[in-house]
Structure formats: structure tokens, C-alpha cells
Amino acid sequence: MKKTSLTFNRVIMALAFLFLYAPIFLLIVFSFNAGDSNTVWEGFSTHWYAELFQDRLIMQSVYTTVLVSLLATIIATIGGTFAAVGFYSLRRRTRNVLNTVNNIPMMNADIVTGVAMCLFFVAFFAFWKDLAIWFNSIQSFIELPTRLTMNFGTLLIAHITFNIPYIILSVGPKLRQLDKNLVDAAMDLGCTWMQAFFKVILPEIKPGIVSGALTAFTMSIDDFIISYFTSGSSSSTLAMTIYGMTKKRVTPEINAISTLLFVTVLVLLAVINIREAHMEQQAQRRKLLSTAEIAARGPEKRRKPNPFMKIGAGALAAVMVITLVVSVHGKTTGRVVNVCSWGEYIDESLITEFEKRTGITVNYQTVESNEALYALLKAGAGDYDVIVPSDYMISRLIEEGMLEELDYSNIPNFELIDERFKNLSYDPENKYTVPYTWGTVGIIYNEDMVGGEITSWSAMFDDQYAGEVLLINNSRDALGFALKTLGYSLNTTDPDQIREAFEMLVDATRRGVYQGKVMDEIFGKMEGGNAAIATYYAGDYLSMADNTDEPLAFVVPEEGSNWFVDAMCVLKDAPHKDEAEAWINFMASTEASLANMDYIWYASPNREALDRYPSYYEELYGEPLDPDVYAIMAPPQEVLDRCESYVNLPAEILALYNDLWIQLGVS
């Protein structure tokens, strides 16, 4: 009976570990795939690792991650060790209370810590601005900067803050094992408190310090949520970069970088566990030795550490930190521009080309939706220079005074923008924007899975596709296609019509029509044949069709849809306005527009690029561009005539959208 129970327990344990590590093992295996598929093995290759180390954005995030982790670990280890010693000197009741307080940040949700730190920095920056203005007004010898933004410094402070509790937790037990009489004896023999600390206390607690430091370094390497809220626009950690890369599809390059991150954390944890096991074995051996045996052996001769080894180790560590500082920040000491856009919404070679031509360093970050961008800006966590929101969000930002008027004399390529994309409703006087891309929202469907052609939004509510339909995770688009199905305008301000559309979504959700809400996760779902129907953007459909053998099709439904324009804007009081306008002018050029159209499959508003793209494609690939593909990329006027552009809705209607969307998530 006991043997059967033991076997059963082992099987359960094996299955648990298999379930836990099988996905990671699969990720590691496909990081060596010669092709770009995550399901079909095409041969062994280290190609993706080579690509990884040649990617400027990834390597910059690696440097930032390692640097912030090293600095945060060093500072937190020093501060946490002295804090632990301070706890140790207190009375037991007080010490227990403080230890409980110390444990709270480790048990607290990272999202709470991240948002709290973000709000703290925003409040401090507002206070600093008022203080600097007052201080500068009463004297002229020292001028304090009035504008502070989230940057590498705030990221470092955040990492130090969440690392210190781990140091205290690791050092505390070693201090409690320490015989207090040793410290008293050392001080009776003439040691100062500091000498007693370094000669007596430090050697005893060193194992705890090392374990705490390794844990802190691991936590910093692995952190995403707190970094996301405190890094600002100029610093991006490796975890943030991976998150941005996964917004489209999981490529073998992402597998490669995830593998390296997993191996790094695994090695650090192994070092921690091996060291702790070694220290426990030493402690047990010491306990086995009797006092008589120790006395019989006589005084143990300890090998004095070579001072040159200490100096060399310190110098090596200093060189590593300095090298990383120079690597990460050497380029940003000059002119920079901080850009925020959507995932895979630019040909990254254009970033390199712009930097080469202008000497301006580009810090490029991504966000998943207009609403996420707005929330980030309102929270004060997005100190960008250039953003690329959609039309309706631009209108909202203008109304709230969050955008800066452009100096179009610095943007001569604005003259290349087709007249159809000037003086639109979101910027009727062309003061704030330069159009970046345009396109339509429609239905993407798998022809084999649906067994025919789709022409209407009613397919999004059809029971025959239950469990195979992806609902776009965007309140305007999701409620928008429901409104169109009912024959209403996308921009209706009638609450009853909006609620009627909402009830359609709720009913379909309860009937199991929707597989789930998605944004860029749609790429993996549709390309892998894991869903039949989805609502998404025409340019992304073309990207999917180009990367899969699944028979995907796209349609702008007969009821009409949304046609959108994403435009480049400069945020109010942007610190690098001249650089921002230089970036906008470069991206609006015909050369950049053609390269970008070919990479992201979205049409450019540049009239020369629109006219030249079919011949550009044929010259580049040696075959003509399919007219049907071009009609999806740059839809003809008859398609646009049955579509609407979003406009910014009144505040009470936006609040209604938000409330209904939250209710839909609950339902």
C-alpha cells in the first residue's frame, strides 16, 4: 500500500513538472529552428541567436537591464545590510513589527507597487517644478531644471526599493544566529563599532548578504510590471522589449531571447541553492567537531586573501559597470527623440538610417492600444516626444491640451501628404499632426473553417461559428461593428443605441460565440488556424497572409466599417521638439514611406509613395503586386464611401463606453 502511494505521488510530481517545464522546453527547442514557424521544425540553426545579437533595440535593452540590475543590487545590498543590522539592534517586539512591514512589499501585487511608484514620481515632479520656479525667481546664481521626467534614474530607484526587502530577509536570519557576545568582546578589546562590524559581524553574515544579492539581481533581471510604470520613454528593460515584441507574433527571435533570459535566471538560482547547501554542510561539519577535537588540532591556519585579488575583482567590477554605463548612455548624451507607437509598426532599418543621417538617437517604445497610451500619458508615465495615435484619440488629446502645435517649416515633407488626409475632422486646421498611415477595419476569416464567403458583420454573432470568433479588445471597434450591424453610426451619441449594441455583444458572449478578447494575439490565433473569424486591421491581415499557409481572407462588410488615420504628433512641452519634428519629417519622406509600406503593409498618406508602391514592389521582389492586395492596403473610394472615421465622443458617452466594456468583461 505504501509503495503504491509512493508511486502515485511520484507520478503526480512528474506530471506537475512536465506541465510546468514542457512549454519552456518547447520554446528552447524552437529557438534553434531554421525557419520562422513555432509549430513546424525546419532544421537546426543558430540563425535567430545571431539575429538577436545584431538587433540594436534588443541589445540596448539588454545593456539597460544588466546595468540597472547591477547598480540596484549593489546599492540595495549595502542599504539592506545596514537596515538589517539596525533591525537586529532593536527590541524583539519592535523588530518583529518592522520585519512584518518589510515583508509587505514582497507579498504585495507588483501592479500596485508599480502604479504607486508612478504616482509618487509624478507628484514629486509636480512639487519639484513649483519649487524650481520659486527658487529660480529669488536668485540667479543657480538655475534648477523645472522639468523632471521618468528615466533611468526613476527605474533604478524603483529597483532599489523593491530589492531592499529581499536583502533584509536574507541577512536577518544570519544576524539572529550571531552570538552578541562576540561583538561585545571585540569592543571590549578596543574595536570601534565600525571595526567590530567589519571584523566580526560581516564575516558571519556574509553568506546571507551574498544570497540576498543574488536574489535581488534575479528579481531585477526578471521584473516587468514595476519597470513598465517607472522607466519613462528613454529606458526599456529586456522584459519590456520582449513584451513589445510579442504584440504581433511569437517569432524564433523571441524564443531565443526568452531562452537566454531563462538560462540566466536558472544559473543564478542554481548558484544561490548550491551556495546555501554548501554553507549548511559546513555548519553541520562544524557541529560534529567536539571542543576537544578542535583543541587537539590547535589553531587553524587561515590563508590570508591576496590583496591583489580583491583589488583586481573590484577593478573588474568597476570596469564592467562603467562600460555598461557608457554603452547605454554614451549615445544619449547628445540629441535624442523619444517615440511611442504600436508594435511592429515601423521598419526598424529606418531608425538606424535616421540616426546615421542626423546623429539623433531614437528611443523607440510600443504600446498596445490608444486607450492604453492615453492611460499612460494621464498617469504621467509617458514622457514621449512623438506619439502615433489614431484619429479619434488625437481629437481627444487636442481637446485636453496635451499636444504641441507643429512648426511645419521644419517638416517640408508635409507637402507630400495627399490632400485627402489634410484638414480632417480630428485636426481641421492642420496644426498638430502629420498623417503616418491609413486603412480600414474589417473581418479576417479562414475560408476553409467558415466554408464560404463572409460579407456581413452578422457573422460576428452567428452561432455556427461558436468558439471560433475573436472579439477585438477595443471598446470603440467592438461596439462599433455591433452598431453597424444594427444600422447605426459608429459615432452615435444616443445611449440607447449604444446599449442595444452592447446587449448584442453580451448575448453573443453568453452563447459562447467568442473564443476571447484579443488585440495583437490575433496573429498567432489566425496564422495557426486556431480561430475562424476576427475583427482587425487591413494592414495586419496582409501581414498575416504573408506569414501563413492558412487560407485567410479579408472583407470590409457591406454595412460599412471604420477607416482610420494614424498620425504623428508631438506632446505638449516635449523636451526634444526640434528632434521630434526632424523625425516626423524623415518618416513623411517618400523613401521612408515606401520602405515602411513594404514592411508593415499599411498604406502611406504620401501621394508619391502611394503612386510608386506597385512598381517599387515589382522592382524589389521581381514580380508584380497583386491588385487585390493593393486594394486591401489602399482601398478604393467606393469602399471608403461606406465607411466612417471615428470622432472624439462627449465625455459622458466615453464614460458609458468604458462602463459597458467593463461590464462585458465581467459577463
Region spans (language model):
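Transmembrane-helix boundary motif in ABC transporter permease subunits
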Residues: 1-6, 71-102, 115-123, 128, ...
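Early extracytoplasmic/lumenal segment of secretory-pathway proteins
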Residues: 328-397, 524
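Glycine/proline-centered hinge or cleavage motifs at structural transition points of membrane proteins
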Residues: 189-190, 203, 437, 441
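Short membrane-interfacial helix/loop motifs at transmembrane-helix boundaries
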Residues: 15, 22-56, 228-233, 281
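Membrane-interfacial helix termini and adjacent extracytoplasmic/periplasmic loops
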Residues: 37, 46, 94, 111-160, ...
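Transmembrane alpha-helices
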Residues: 12, 17-24, 108, 161, ...
